[in-house]
């Protein structure tokens, strides 16, 4: 079986079909496992380590058995499973839905955005909604696409699933409030480590993507270097900063960070440009990943 074939088929499946049904989605199962396990474990850093191992093991170890299957069964199962932990279509569709609603009903746009971001969306303006939609799109192309592919290259299907387990844990318990600060410490630090390289590769690839699209590639590179470390997360700023520069916009989470230079305003066209930029960046990343796997078997 060719890992390149698995990757390309998985990407095609995700683009054509999108997310698996809720009841069959492995990331949903991961979330359910986290909820169940954390009710058993105490709230300590040791509990966070145990939680990570306890959730990761059943989602990764059985995947090694797939290697013993013969083609084409191996190829089909591996491609379906990999497609389930990448989310290109969902990211793009979600951003476009927010933009579409913003044209007609700002309350509906706020509601749809609230399902994508943690910030309070009830009083956001048009520009703030557009900024938040661009931020979540460009940040999550790492979490939901390039990082799983990166660990698929390194460790095969178990690597991609291990990453999504850690990312899911971080999303659920990786917070600084009293309830999660201790149990979420290990998953949050591990998520930072696992995202370190993929986030930087993805941010850098946005620069040639901007060039190919006729966007501000020089600004993309400049803002990437200047603003990438302004976010609380050590990783999320790389793609957001590169996008802000490419789009010649300023992205802001009030009271938390400001990325990019002041601009005349954010509108729906900028959100559409962000979708184009993110999509081409993912194409470049996928092609680069396939090339690496062909050169280094």
Curated annotation (Swiss-Prot):
Topology in the lipid bilayer: Multi-pass membrane protein
Localization, UniProt: Cell membrane
Keywords associated with the record: Cell membrane, Cobalamin biosynthesis, Membrane, Transmembrane, Transmembrane helix
GO BP of this protein: cobalamin biosynthetic process
One Pfam family matching this protein: CobD_Cbib
GO cellular component: plasma membrane
Transmembrane segment boundaries: 46-66, 72-92, 141-161, 193-213, 277-297
Database matches in InterPro entries: Cobalamin_biosynth_CobD/CbiB
HAMAP family: CobD_CbiB
Annotated function: Converts cobyric acid to cobinamide by the addition of aminopropanol on the F carboxylic group.
Protein name (database record): Probable cobalamin biosynthesis protein CobD
Gene: cobD
């Amino acid at each position: 079986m060719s890992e390149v074939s698995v990757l390309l088929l998985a990407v095609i499946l995700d683009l054509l079909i999108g997310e698996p049904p809720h009841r069959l989605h492995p990331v949903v199962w991961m979330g359910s496992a986290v909820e169940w396990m954390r009710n058993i474990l105490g709230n300590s850093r040791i509990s966070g380590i145990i939680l990570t191992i306890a959730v990761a093991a059943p989602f990764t170890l059985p995947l090694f058995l797939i290697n013993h299957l013969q083609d084409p069964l191996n190829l089909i199962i591996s491609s379906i499973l990999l497609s389930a932990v990448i989310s290109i279509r969902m990211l793009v569709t979600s951003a476009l839905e927010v933009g579409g609603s913003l044209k007609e009903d700002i309350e509906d746009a706020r509601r749809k955005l609230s399902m994508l971001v943690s910030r309070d969306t009830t009083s956001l303006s048009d520009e703030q909604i557009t900024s938040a939609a661009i931020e979540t799109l460009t940040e999550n192309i790492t979490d939901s696409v390039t990082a799983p592919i990166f660990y698929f290259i390194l460790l095969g299907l178990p690597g991609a699933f291990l990453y999504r387990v850690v990312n899911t844990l971080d999303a659920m318990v990786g917070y600084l409030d009293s309830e999660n600060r201790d149990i979420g410490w290990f998953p949050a630090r591990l998520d930072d480590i696992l995202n370190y390289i993929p986030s930087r590769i993805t941010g850098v690839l946005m620069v040639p993507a901007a060039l190919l699209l006729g966007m501000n590639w020089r600004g993309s590179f400049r803002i990437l270097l200047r603003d990438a470390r302004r976010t609380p997360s050590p990783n999320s700023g790389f793609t957001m900063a590169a996008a802000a520069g490419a789009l010649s916009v300023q992205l802001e989470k009030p009271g938390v960070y400001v990325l990019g230079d002041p601009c005349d305003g954010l509108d729906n066209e900028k959100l559409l440009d962000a979708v184009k930029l993110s999509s081409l960046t993912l194409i470049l990343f996928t092609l680069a990943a396939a090339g690496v796997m062909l050169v280094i078997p």
